[in-house]
Amino acid sequence: MKNKFVELVEKSQLRTDLPEFNPGDSITVNLWIKEGDKQRIQAFKGFVLRKRNRGLHSAFTVRKMSSGMGVERTFQTHSPLIDSIIVEKRADVRRAKLYYMRGLTGKAARIKEKV
């Protein structure tokens, strides 16, 4: 059980501008990257492999294929480094964690789109 003051501070840090998404959805995460003294936005496009809902400590993992290699990146949902999240496609999956997708390639790695 958390202290009421801690809960109040955490509640003020939560972001409300992010869209709702689920595992399997194809999303683009635009995040701020700092290189030296310059800042720019970099896009990471892939599908949501897993989502962890823990209030301020929520996180999600996005997987994409880059030059034939699978790349996974975990983001903190309420991070100030995330500029925006764009949901490209909604998926119809029956699992909460899509770890089995790591071993699939080609046509086997397709996800059914929600109609």
UniProtKB/Swiss-Prot annotation:
One of its GO terms (molecular function) is structural constituent of ribosome. It comes from the Bacteria. GO terms for biological process: translation. GO terms for cellular component: cytosolic large ribosomal subunit. Keywords: Ribonucleoprotein, Ribosomal protein. InterPro entries: Ribosomal_bL19, Ribosomal_bL19_CS, Ribosomal_bL19_sf, Translation_prot_SH3-like_sf. The keyword RNA-binding does not apply. PANTHER family: LARGE RIBOSOMAL SUBUNIT PROTEIN BL19M, RIBOSOMAL PROTEIN L19. Belongs to the bacterial ribosomal protein bL19 family. This protein is located at the 30S-50S ribosomal subunit interface and may play a role in the structure and function of the aminoacyl-tRNA binding site. This is Large ribosomal subunit protein bL19. It comes from Francisella tularensis subsp. novicida (strain U112).
